[in-house]
Every structure is written in C-alpha cells, then in structure tokens.
Amino acid sequence: MGLKKFFKIKPPEEATPEQNKDTLMELGISVKNPSKKRKEKFAAYGKFANDKAEDKVYAPPGYEQYARPQDELEDLNASPLDANANEATAGSNRGSSGTQDLGNGAESNSMQDPYAIENDDYRYDDDPYARFQANKSNGRGSVNAAPYGDYGGGYNGTSLNSYNNDGPYSNQNTSNSWVNANGRNSLNHSNSTLNVGPSRQTRQPPVSTSTNSLSLDQRSPLANPMQEKRNPYADMNSYGGAYDSNTNRSSGTRQGSSKNANPYASMANDSYSNGNLNRSANPYSSRSVRQPQSQQAPMTYTPSFIASDEAARNSEVDLNEEPRTGEFDFEEVYADKSAENRAALDEPDLNAVMTNEDSIDLNASEVDHSSRQQQQQQWFMDEQQQQQQHFNATNNQYGDQRGYKTFEEIQKEEEARQQQEEDEAVDEIKQEIKFTKQSSVASTRNTLKMAQDAERAGMNTLGMLGHQSEQLNNVEGNLDLMKVQNKVADEKVAELKKLNRSILAVHVSNPFNSKRRRREREEQLKNRKIEEKLMREQTSQQLSQSTQRIEGAMNANNNISEVRERYQRKNVLEKAKRYQFENDEEDDEMELEIDRNLDQIQQVSNRLKKMALTTGKELDSQQKRLNNIEESTDDLDINLHMNTNRLAGIR
C-alpha cells in the first residue's frame, strides 16, 4: 500500500487552455493572441483560388461513383401526399444533378391527388378522352376544343354534340361560307366526319353539279375513300360550271366571275381532286345524329348514258350566239385598241377639197416670198446642223466609218488607254495599301488582346502567390511560438524530474552562490525574449518583402497621360506620311490606332517581363520558407517526442 493511497493524495486537476494561457502569460512566456488578426491584402485571390480549384479523383471507367461520397438514400416510405415530399424530391434532384428542369418542376409541384373528389363531371360526356383535354382550349373558349379547329365554320355551323364536345373524336360537322355545293373547304375538315357507307339521297335546291362529281358518284360506294387524294378547290369553278375530260370543254351555264370565284376550279382531274372523304364517327358516341346542311350539296347518282347526253349537248357551241351577261368578249375588248394601233396610210385623199395652203399664191407680195424663203433656209440650216452633229458622233464612235483611223485618233485612244491603265494601277495600289493597313490594325488588336489576357493571368498568379505568402507567414508565426513554449516545457520537465526523486535524496542549493544563479536566470530569460523577438521580426520581414514584390509588379500599369498622347499624335502623323498615299481621315485614324496598339503591346510586354521576374523571385523565396518550415517542424516533432518520453519515465 503506497503512501499516496495511505494519505489519500490525489493528483491535481488538469488545467484548461484558458488557465494554461494565463499561467504562461504570468510567467512572461509568449502566447498566441486569438483576437489579433492581421490584415490580409490578397484574401480575395485566396477565394478566387478556392473557386477555381477542382476536386480531381482517379477511378477506372464505371467506378467514378465510388470515388465521391454517396448521396443520401431515397426514403422508400415517402409518399407523394406528404407535406415535404416535393421539396425533398426537388432538393435531391438539385443535389444529384445541380440543375432542375422547369417543366418537370412544375409538374412535381402540382401532383394530382388520386383520392381527391373530381370537380368536373364526365359521366355524360360522349368522348372518354375528353378529361385529358380539359385543360386545353383554343381561342373561342371551348372547354375541350381541338387546337386546330375549323377555320371558317365555327360561327355558322351546326353542332351535333349536345354537350358541346369539340374534341378530336366528336361528330361535330361545321360548314364554311366559302365552300361550294359540291366541295368542302380544306380548312374546314379537321372535325368534320362523313359516313363510310353510301350517302343518303336527299332533295336540295337545284345547284350546278360538275362532271367530276358524276364520275366520283359512279364509283363503288363501298370503296375505301381514304385512298384518294383530295383537292379542296376542285369543285369551285370560277364560271360556275365544270370541266369535261372527254370533250375538253367547259360544261354548264357559264356565269360571270365574282369575287368569290375559285381560281383553282380547273384542277378537277388533278391527282388531288376532291374525293368522297369519309371519316369514321366516334365509336363511343351515342348521340351522333347527322343533320342535313343547307350549304352542302347532296351526293346524287346519275346514270352514265344521261351524263354522256348532257356532255354532248353541252359541247355544241353556237358561234352566232350573243355574249351572255358577264362573259368575256375578245372582240369588244380589243376592237378599240386595234383601231388605235392601226397606222394611217400616206395615200392622198382624192376627194379632199383643195385649200390655199397647198397651192402657190401668184398674187402674193415679195415680202411674203422673202419670209417664206428665209423660213425654208432656216429649216435647211437646222437640218444640216443635225446631220453634222450626227456625223461627228459617228466619226468619234466608229472612226468615220472609213475603215481606217487617223494618227491623231489612234494617239488619243492610246493615251486614253494608258491613262486608264495607270488609274487602275493606282486604284489597285490604294486598295492594297488600305487592305494592308486594315490587316495591320486587326493584327495589332489581336496581339494586344492576347497580351492583355496573358497579363491578367500573370496578375492572378501573383495574387495567389501573395495569399500563399500570407498563409506561410501564419504558419511561421505558429512555429515560432511552438519553439518558445517547447523550451519552457523542457525546463519544466527537468524540474519535475528533480522534484520526483527519492525522498531520501535531499537537494539543498548552495546559499553562497544564490546571487549568481539569479543573474544567470535573468540572463536566460532576457536572451529567450530577444531570440523570440528576432524570430518574429524575421518572419514579418519575409512577409513584407513578398508583399512589396507582388504589389510592385501589379501596380506597374504606366498609364499614358492625355498631354503626352496629344503631342505624340502629331509625331505619329508626321512619321506615317512616308507610308501614306492620298491619305484621308480614315487612314490617319488607322495609323494612330496601329501606333497606339504597338505602344500598348510594348508596355504590356514590359509588365509581363517584370511579372515573370517577380514570380520567379517569389517562388524562390517561398521555397526557402517552406524548407525552413519543414526543418522547424521536424525539430519540434523530435523535441516533443523527447519530452513525452521523459514525462513517461518519471514515476
């Protein structure tokens, strides 16, 4: 049984970090002040470096998901009806992909409750698919309207669905005011349906039927009508009649063209002619009742012999027949024009009465004869002048039509040709000079842009090196504190070892050298404080030098003053005259821009050189600091290991 247990001696309580810090401060030992924060000049570049950093992992193909932390597993017990189900789903989607589809997000936020009571009653709807189109609507306010509803018949047609169902399976037939008796408009067939079987024979007011409709009715009524193409304009003849393919004549009573006439009516035998387009009715509808419409012609059947008699009777044309109302008459239209264009003959009119103007007045005076003679001379001179002008123009153009040219004419032509060639050569040189200048301007712009990009990258590199230097300074300061406190720990371990000796080993200090020991102790504390201060100053000096280097490289912009640029403009224009030919304002601007860009490129190049040198020096300095940090860390690690072993050996 030990003495400690016998006297019930307990070990002292472990001191907290705050108590330990206060104790060290009372003893005069340096500690770290957490409230003191150094101002960092390059903290923004540190944030920039963190944003640009990439977490690169290495994994074989197909195993990339194991190199990253697994996402949260989906809750299998989650229900769409939960309050936070949509938010959790959206959050997981954002976490996995980083983006969210707007369309899918809208659907997920508006999920339908399968247990909710339906507000719309579809029990009496003929269309079983109408509920899936309840949210759609065309421009006319129908609930289940088709998006491509009939164009011209939505307001004058008759709806056959008692519940106003205008869906794609409804039997609603609409009419259009533009359709003819035997045709349907192509814009009015989206929702119209026809019976597959033979149509009902109904009586309608007499309308003009075409031969095309007869030929269509002679077909088998049970044939598949969907195999034939449909021309929406086949039955709408501009003259009210139809075209007979056998006689190549228009049959029926011709009528005057109106504003509603169809210009495509002659295309009756086109491969896209209007067939009997049949569409099946809605198989789910029980109220599909077909009602006759006043504007649609009945589909009647006419025997072939009656059709041939009508065609033969219509083919006979009476040449003496008077033109009908509204019919185009060629003679009436072009009679006046032919009369106007008919040139009058120069033959004399033998029945015309002779006047005094055509005869010579023998009793006229000499004055009248002289005036008449002067007038004739004037006419003759004008005629000669016109002939001379025409003659000169002909000589200039065709060399007098003599078959040869004079020496003067040849010399003039040669001079004109040489002048033209010289002008063309000068213009070509001008264009080459202008093109070269434009190319030079573009080249200087591109070079300046690339130089500025390189300068920006260099500044970013220097900024990140500055932030790295600040972080290294923090590490060095912490290592200095660790060195000082580790020395204090060595002394405390030695003192503890001395106090933990055997109780029989009495240690008594020499009373005659107490003053000397006190002086040694004071010198030791003083030297320790000086050493600590020197380490701190050295660390701060390294940071200051690094900051000055980086700031000097980043602040060297060398901005050009306006006064210098104004005086430099004159010098540039004077030097540019050697390379200019008939220069204008545009040429001067290009010369100035070229000189300005070259000057800026030179300045950027100088700054890039300075940045490169500064970067090299900074890297060397930080490399030395890193080596010192490595050595200091190794020494501290060894000292801590030794103190730990010493403490373990004290019993």
Curated annotation (Swiss-Prot):
GO terms for molecular function: SNAP receptor activity; SNARE binding; syntaxin binding. Residues 1-22, 53-299, 313-332 are annotated as: Disordered. The keyword Repeat applies. GO terms for cellular component: cellular bud neck; cytosol; fungal-type vacuole membrane; Golgi membrane; plasma membrane; SNARE complex. Residues 120-129, 313-327 have a biased composition (Basic and acidic residues). It comes from the Eukaryota. The modification Phosphoserine is found at residues 79, 92, 186, 190, 213, 271, 273, 315, 359. The modification Phosphothreonine is found at residue 355. Residues 285-296 have a biased composition (Low complexity). Residues 86-112, 157-218, 244-284 have a biased composition (Polar residues). Keywords: Coiled coil, Phosphoprotein, Protein transport, Repeat, Transport. GO terms for biological process: exocytosis; Golgi to plasma membrane transport; Golgi vesicle fusion to target membrane; intracellular protein transport; SNARE complex assembly; vesicle fusion; vesicle fusion to plasma membrane. Residues 434-496, 588-650 form the t-SNARE coiled-coil homology domain. Belongs to the SNAP-25 family. Interacts with SRO7 and SRO77. Component of a SNARE complex that may be the effector of SEC4 function in exocytosis. This is Protein transport protein SEC9. The lineage of its organism: Eukaryota, Fungi, Dikarya, Ascomycota, Saccharomycotina. The gene is SEC9.
